[in-house]
Amino acid sequence: MTDSQKKLRITARAGYEPHFSWSYLHPKNWGIWLGIFVLLLLAFVPFRLRDKMAEKLARALAKKIGKPRIRAEINLKLCFPDWTDEQRNKVIEEMFVTVAQVMLGIGEIAIRSKKHLQKRSEFIGLEHIKQAKAEGHNIILMVPHGWAIDASGIILHTHGMPMTSMYNPHRNPLVDWLWTLARQRFGGKMHARQNGIKPFLAHIKQGQMGYYLPDEDFGAEQSVFVDFFATYKATLPGLNKMAKLAKAVVIPMFPRYNAKSGKYEMEIRPPMQLSEDPEQSARAMNEEIEYFVTPTPEQYVWILQLLRTRKDGEDIYPD
């Protein structure tokens, strides 16, 4: 059995436990350590100053970012065909500003105190989670890919809401180790997606809230085609089944970074009424994404290959 196979078996049982390796100090990683040092310094810079720095950096680089920008343009053209080029470019530039503000704030999220992070957060609709807990339900949070998705997951822990989630390990072991330490520092468990869904569901049954990302494209075989904004999307249909297996209600939540208030906002909606029909269940999920994203499209991760799987097999994204 290979080391990677052993690791998957261990994480399937207990969740990922990050461990330090002396190889992380190899000179090839010194650039990463330098970047970490800069982020840790920025953790103590007032957020308004840091956000201004991030905005200037983003606007300077926005037009130089090739493939991610092209993917965002393709996604927005299909989802909002009535938009002008000016509208689309404005959203993309604002998105890159949001990216930079969130990225330069990673150090703050990773090392500042629980009390500090609580002050930097705001909930809209928290009563929906409180009510579900009071009624004795397990909870799966259905969380679309907003740029503040990792920050909000960590912040939820500080408010006494431990999370369990599935993730794709980073290709660099040092980055994977550091970021998993940050994600788990207040509790909760991360599970490698390669282990399947059972470890994730097991921790939900134990009382942790599931942090489920619904909008990646996993191909036609695992998906159904349902409407997504003005186009369609290969969407995973198993949310209702997952909720039943975990004996949980599904509560939609969307994370945003509000640069005006300097707070990470988490908007929470009432529990979803999911259908037994896979297509109706998948469409209900996309409707929640549309509700969250439409008023603040710059907060959404448009650079993903969200629409990769097309009915006619067309490859819409450049290599």
Regions found by a protein language model. Give the residues of each.
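Non-catalytic C-terminal accessory region of glycerolipid acyltransferases
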Residues: T2-I10, Y16-H19, H26, N89-E93, ...
